[in-house]
UniProtKB/Swiss-Prot annotation:
This is Succinate--CoA ligase [ADP-forming] subunit beta. The keyword Nucleotide-binding applies. Succinyl-CoA synthetase functions in the citric acid cycle (TCA), coupling the hydrolysis of succinyl-CoA to the synthesis of either ATP or GTP and thus represents the only step of substrate-level phosphorylation in the TCA. The beta subunit provides nucleotide specificity of the enzyme and binds the substrate succinate, while the binding sites for coenzyme A and phosphate are found in the alpha subunit. It comes from the Bacteria. The lineage of its organism: Bacteria, Pseudomonadati, Pseudomonadota, Gammaproteobacteria, Enterobacterales. Mg(2+) binds at residues 199, 213. The keyword Ligase applies. One of its GO terms (molecular function) is ATP binding. NCBIfam families: PRK00696.1 (NF001913), sucCoAbeta (TIGR01016). Keywords: ATP-binding, Ligase, Magnesium, Metal-binding, Nucleotide-binding, Tricarboxylic acid cycle. It comes from Enterobacter sp. (strain 638). Pfam families: ATP-grasp_2 (PF08442), Ligase_CoA (PF00549). SUPFAM superfamilies: Glutathione synthetase ATP-binding domain-like, Succinyl-CoA synthetase domains. ATP binds at residues 46, 53-55, 99, 102, 107. Heterotetramer of two alpha and two beta subunits.
Length: 388
């Protein structure tokens, strides 16, 4: 679950981290009033959406008058912002963040993620702030410095100083950086985060560090014990199909293709998408129904997949381990009958009672194509989309 920038900065303030004075506003009038609270300009106005690249898309602007603030708010509130990180529809802009402008001398980067290979929280810092860290990692990886947090000892001040020295910081900036590092680590661990990022972390012309931007991603599996973070959730920023899938404990991610995929198991789902691509198709989604692929969940999965108007065919790929394939077949037949599927459905069953499941599909009289293998399934679903 992602948070907005203003929400991230609210958390920063609770933990004593430096950030510009700012207010999240829902109307143009509130935006003007926020500027008055902050004081004399210039100010920075920012669209609040769960996506990067806002500046290049016109969603961030430095303004010198309240008239400009009102004009910006009137232009963006209620509209959708399209960036390189969104789809063609963009994300809805429901709030504008108005902040005091900051005089920037240098931009840095500081962030943390859970590193699965080391099974630790790893902090990353770089002198290349203000740009995508993925781009820095690809083009100049030597400019990214890392420290891993020991799960028993926790974050240590010397680790913050180590990163500060590698960034070339001196004097009071080392102390300020270490405080920010320790604060971010505390937020990350206490709030069960999956991602925290300050990009950029800036050195002002007065020689101080300021968290100019903030990005937080909470671990959805830990939200049950983070009630205040749950209340910050903005479902308007989420794909409606993904939100519906989450209610049924289905792992769904919308993509841009036209072949709907329903699979049990995340690894098998990724492999299914790969082989569809290999044979010239484009997956419309990632959907893992998990081990408990009951008729009800399969039915709901079909509804979610078919709510995407781009879907021209559906590929169901089920490996029956604990779950019997004949029961899965019953679920598929029931779901197709209930939902009224009007596109070709290709089904590949493998494992426990696979032959019985395939026979049930063949005898159902429905527009269901039984595939003999995963390759055969991919070829058939691509051919169905192409009308062959």
């Amino acid at each position: 679950m992602n948070l907005h920038e203003y929400q991230a900065k609210q958390l920063f303030a609770r933990y004593g981290l430096p950030a510009p004075v700012g207010y999240a506003c829902n109307t143009p009038r509130e935006a003007e009033e926020a500027a008055s609270k902050i004081g004399s300009g210039p100010w920075v106005v920012k669209c609040q959406v769960h996506a990067g690249g806002r500046g290049k898309a016109g969603g961030v602007k430095v303004v010198k008058s309240k008239e400009e603030i009102r004009a910006f708010a009137e232009h963006w509130l209620g509209k959708r912002l399209v960036t390189y990180q969104t789809d063609a529809n963009g994300q809805p802009v429901n709030q504008i963040l108005v902040e005091a402008a900051t005089d920037i001398a240098k931009e840095l980067y500081l962030g943390a993620v859970v590193d699965r290979s080391s099974r630790r929280v790893v902090f990353m810092a770089s002198t290349e702030g203000g740009v995508e860290i993925e781009k820095v990692a690809e083009e100049t990886p030597h400019l990214i410095h890392k420290v891993a947090i020991d799960p028993l000892a926790g974050p240590m001040p010397y680790q913050g100083r180590e990163l500060a020295f590698k960034l070339g910081l001196e004097g009071k900036l080392v102390q300020q950086f270490t405080k920010i590092f320790m604060g971010l680590a505390k937020i990350f661990l206490e709030r069960d985060l999956a991602l925290i990022e300050i990009n950029p972390l800036v050195i002002t012309t007065q020689g101080d560090l300021i968290c100019l931007d903030g990005k937080l991603g909470a671990d959805g599996n830990a939200l049950f014990r983070q009630s205040d973070l749950r209340e910050m959730r903005d479902q308007s920023q989420e794909d409606p199909r993904e939100a519906q899938a989450a209610q049924w404990e289905l792992n769904y991610v919308a993509l841009d293709g036209n072949i709907g995929c329903m699979v049990n198991g995340a690894g098998l789902a990724m492999g299914t998408m790969d082989i569809v691509k290999l044979h010239g198709g484009e997956p419309a989604n990632f959907l893992d129904v998990g081990g408990g692929a009951t008729k009800e969940r399969v039915t709901e999965a079909f509804k979610i997949i078919l709510s995407d108007d781009k879907v021209k065919a559906v590929l169901v790929n089920i490996f029956g381990g604990i779950v019997r394939c004949d029961l899965i077949a019953d679920g598929i037949i029931g779901a197709v009958e209930e939902v009224g599927v009007n596109v070709p459905v290709v089904v590949r069953l493998e494992g426990n009672n696979a032959e019985l499941g395939a026979k049930k599909l063949a005898d159902s009289g429905l527009n269901i194509i039984a595939a003999k293998s995963l390759t055969d399934a991919a070829q058939q679903v691509v051919a169905a989309v192409e009308g062959k």
